[in-house]
Amino acid sequence: MVELAESRFIKLQEELPRLFNRWIEKKSANPRWVMVIDLTRCVGCYSCQASCKMENGVPYEYFRTHVEVIERGTYPNVRRVFLPRLCNHCDNPSCVPVCPVGATYKREDGIVVVDYERCIGCGYCVQACPYGARYSNPETGTVDKCDYCLHKLSDGEVPACVSNCMGGARIFGDVNDPESPVSKVLSSKAVATLKPETGNDPRVYYVGLEEATKIGPGEAIVINPKVGGVIRT
Amino acid sequence: MTEKVITRRGFIKLGIVAGLAVAASATIGLPVYEKLFLKQVPPEKIKAIKERIRRGGVQVKYTACVMCAAECALEVWVKDGRVVRIYGNPHLTYNSGGAACAKAVSGLQLQYSPYRIQYPLKRVGERGEGKFIRISWDQAIDEIAKKLVEIKKKYGPEALLTDTGDVTDRDQYWRLTFAFGSPNAVEHGAICDTPRRHGPKLIVNGKRWEPDILRPVPVRMPDGSIQWYNKHDAKLIIYVGWNPFTATRIVWENIGTVRAKAENGCKVYVIDPGFSNTATLADKWFPIRAGTDADLFAAMLRYILEHDNPQDPNRQYINYEVIEKYVEGWSEFLEAFKSWWDKIDPVTGKKYFTLEWAEARTGLPREDIEKLAHEFGVMKPAALIWGMQSPGHHYNGYVASILGCVLNIITGNFEIPGGVIDTEIVKSSKGGTATGKQFNKRKVKRIINGVEVEAEQEKLHYAWYGDWPAAWDDVVGDLPRMIMEGITLKYGPFRGHKYPIAAYILRTGNTLVTAGPVYKFIEAFMAKNPDGTYKLELFVYIDTIFLESGLYADYVLPEASYLERMSLSDIYPTHPIIFLRDAVVEPLFEAKKPTEIMNMLAKKIYEYEMKEFGRSDIDPKEFWEKYKTEEDFVNEMLQVAPGRPNVGRPLPFPNQPEGYILYGTPESLDEGRVVIDHEKKVVRGEPVTVEYLRKHYGGTMWPMSWYRYREWDAEKNDWKSGGIITTKTKKLELKFHKYETYNKLVEEAGVIPLSWKVLGWEKLPLTFYWFETVWNYYTNPEYAKYREEYPFQLICARVHHAMSGTQMCEWLAQTPAEGLWIPLSEQFELKMAETIPGGKEIVNVAKSLPKNTWCIGTAQINRVDAEKYGIKTGDLIVLENPLGRKAVAKAYVCETVRPGVIRIGFATGGRFSPGLGGTYYHRLYTPNHSELVDYKLSPIMGQPCFADMIVKVRKTTIEEAVNMLPEYYRIQFRIEGVGTI
Amino acid sequence: MSEEENLPNLSEKEYISLLLFRAQIYSILRNIFLFEPSREYLNNLLQDRFLNKIIEVYPEKCLRDSASDFLEAVMEILRGGENALIDTWAEYTRLFIGPGPPATPPYESLWIDEHEARRYKGEAWLKVRDWLLDEGLILESQTILEDHAGIEFEYMMVSTIKAVEMLEKNDRTGFINILIKQKKFLEEHLITWIIKLCDAIEQKSHSSFYKSFARFTKYFIKEDEDLLKQILNNL
């Protein structure tokens, strides 16, 4: 019986996670974590939305990340777009200065976090965020938001929404590392951010955003599980 | 105390220490009653501990999902005996390199659902009342076994029909059924999409044709190494009635389509009455009329045949070499096909299969049809893929299936990189002798009209020798009639033999809701003999969750969930891959694994049979003495892996003979640790085992190759047809030799099956044939009279669920899809499976959810149609079919469905079992598609025609709706143990 | 405190003696931190005369003095009968266990400076646990953690004994490597907090047993750091 550790088939299997960017390979001395969402690859499966709840204990009524569905056009020239949304980990976040106890701050590595010990649950930051990325968790009495699954990052693993993404639409990595998946996407594709006019300098990029949010003729139908119902705009 | 100042050296030299306890052992200065806390352990153990710590005290295990038919490879994290995380397995390629969809993740909410069946239940009161009491396993097994033996005595063992429903790891139940003496074991395949698979079965003895977009695949390099081939080759994919982005059954088509488009500029066309999620990425959406796929394919074929020109590079559609060498019966097929070309179609007044004819039938502009035909002909490699909903659910789906295969074959796209692969004939085999099919070869005797007849047990089959001689995938849609009328065998040696369906074991299935019109099944399950006893004398329901069918069962047995049992994943890749479903946690409550249930029942049946008959068909050595654990069972199932021939290029194992069937681990085959049988042409390596799979991250694979329909013939120094093609002639058969067996059976008996007669057939035609679908006034003149009153075609489509057993999962109630599953719920209270901060585990809590926060099944309707009726999104409407059956739904008004079509999500509405948790609460204003389906079965295979129906529409109120729905929607069922945590 | 004298080259036997000496002391430190002292144990301390020898001839005055005080305290307890023993146990509990926060909890995590780490199972605990794992050691206990002073001392003890075994097998490299690791452990862990802990015990304890023990521990740790430095310089 050959030593299975030498099996070429096991070796092939061990190459796979690298091929699919499941792990954070190299860490530069000063990583800057950034996410790119490629809307041309999103298949609207909601895996990110559900995986995040599983990973971070987000209650049913709330979301750290969610996916909106936008339908536009007139039969048969119609379009449907899926728009995954999350905290944009802004460089100039409007949520940070409003905190009365200094419980929220932007880390060196770019992640905007909440210190749950300090947070008193006043909810000012929830209102201050133009993206509605935060929520008040009644279970914990604090606010909660995306933290790029920090607990996984420290183990060299990508956030749950990234590893479970069916279409490979969520790309995550260190923008200071030119070999990282995000750096490669950012240098080869046109990207845009949501609501740049807020001045928050959001650091979640989208490929194909213009196409998705283009105002065309006819109304748009928007379904947002965070809000419920069907919205016509 | 003196103050001697000495040096350290001096101190040591004084031998002070030497005089003390010098034993170099761990007992220095230790009081007798204490031992060391620190323990030295070997490096492997340290490695394992470090890995566990790295994941926070969590065990990482590999298993396979069951939340939909894709059965993806999972990596699950288990802590303190509970599953806390579900991810995709990144060490296998099957699901997008380790992705896991929302359904997979929501599996946590099925596993820890408050609505799981906790213990065995026995019915008290009438079937359908939903009144059960708790009983012990011993009592349940005892009573069921006793009853089964009773039934065997009265009618013969063939009176037992075992239906293992929607979940594929069912071999234990089939084995038990066959050993008991009944050949009647069926599963979901019978009601899935048999017409869709028909062409592949006839032509290549296969089943599912999928585009070659599974990447990466392992291929053999010229230097002998194996490397990942990660490049996409497809240039054009046409999805007809197939929606990989939502109906994730062949999961790798999901990311495969995305990547082929992004990395290889592959064009994607979606042909579907509804704008499916797959269409969001497509280069063009062709909103075809429902039920006209065959018409489209016929027109494409005619166009290709009429315009093909080998001299013109822009018209080189047909690959003549493939046809000449590897296809049987092409000229006859062509002749039969062409024989329609001059006929005038009474419905449209146009010649069959012309572009104008197709335009009139499909509702697509002729330029579009021409575009499809031309591009499919000229762009290579290309793949034409047709689906389950359509044509699989249409009466005439066979026609489309056969034409689809022909189109792929003659354009030279079959088995080429980026083309079309028949995944059934290249996937790894599994099951083998564990399934017990060998028991069906037993010789049995029956007395028929006073004459004793002896033949094999399988000749008693209720369908193959009953009314459906050609239904090789069995028939479940006809169960209601069969229960009411009983079985009379008409074919084979046992013809004339009669028996009832007296016992029905339904495992992980929900035929009441998924196999046809609900009321028909209820009627059959409730039917009584004159003496007041049920015609169906025994109904056993086995599952983890309590679905509608359970309401009519006599016994309900809790089966271990997919995370609690071991089996093999049933997958359809483009090359052999196999992975394990591992029991990662212990069964909750009193749930038992299938192997245990099989053994318990087998033993009790054995005991009763010995008492009753003095002998038993159950051999202890074939059950509990052989399978002490489920691992024993799965190891036997793995003996036949991969069971595929060493063919194609690059040749998977150049060191093994080409064309020989391979068994065993890829390592043993690779390294020559094999035994070769030159007579049987088999290479046997070391068998794959459960332990082996666990060491390989849960699964393993054998190399991919293409052109597997041919083998190199060394003698003739040329290619010959064969390889994976195991048809009679070893060629791609457009002369349908497969039908010959059935025609012979029918001829011998002199009885033509009713469903063939309706088509005007005395036997199955061995080449191209054409007939129309039903309930379709665009194609079948018989239905013209309904056009005005019932202006809508009703079709069913998919949302982020699968089968009918996941709709209690709360996270899936937040996944709006395609206008069919929309957050328009009323406010309600429920018990739910909820996560806690930090995601530490799933607990059960009671919550009140406000309006519009839970997705419900809706009826999707085009805006233009809605405006005619004054319907707006959220309005309650009633759908009524010509049979007077009704369903109620909230409307979703949009632009993303063809006018004249109404679309409903499968199993999204009218769910009247409390086991459906939150979805149960909305049953009164959500549509159950099965209420509107006709009891109409397609010929040949007896598939229910789920997609053939027409309806009329009007607005209604909730009061009216409540009164017009059948009673079982209004009852508030409370099932013992279900939802009572 | 340390003398300016360097340790010259020793013979193999002498190294072994030195190692066993160190192991013996670590064993005492380990026992006193991990368990309430039994009468039997205290008697052993007296009778095996190990401490007496130290008092008589060890070059370092602080060590001699604190050992002397410690032995005195031991004798006092033995003379004091049952009550004295029980008082000692009560003191052990008050210092190291509870109820409520113990006066001087013997866990490295709680004595390290960074304010986030000041909790049980903090950064320091993580490091010690990983250190032990790298040495192939796991802690089998439901009630104490790896960064307990007694466990850290147990580690020093068992690794010293291992070093003896290496020498006896003539595995010089193995022997040196262990000493290198021990020096690192001392510097990165023991030195950083044991002194603080011992100062606190000295300050807060009412019992001369624990006060003198704390002093002895403190001085020995410093001494051992020195010893190791000098041994390694020669090798």
Task: Annotate each language-model stretch with its function.
Chain B
Residues 265, 269, 274-379:
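Long, well-ordered, tryptophan-enriched scaffold segments
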Residues 165-166, 376, 420-431, 615-635:
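A glycine-rich phosphate-binding loop feature that marks nucleotide/adenosyl-phosphate handling sites
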Residues 173-260, 264-269, 295, 405-551, ...:
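Extended redox/cofactor-interaction regions of prokaryotic respiratory oxidoreductases
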Residues 394, 594-656, 665-666, 812-981:
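Long, contiguous, secondary-structure-rich segments that constitute the structural scaffold
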Residues 2-312, 336, 450, 505-507, ...:
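N-terminal export/assembly segments and adjacent metallocofactor-ligating motifs
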Residues 277, 548-580:
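Flexible glycine/proline-rich, aromatic-decorated loop/lid segments
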Residues 282-287, 577-587:
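Short beta-alpha connecting loops at secondary-structure transitions
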Residues 537-538, 583-602:
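Phosphate/diphosphate-binding loops
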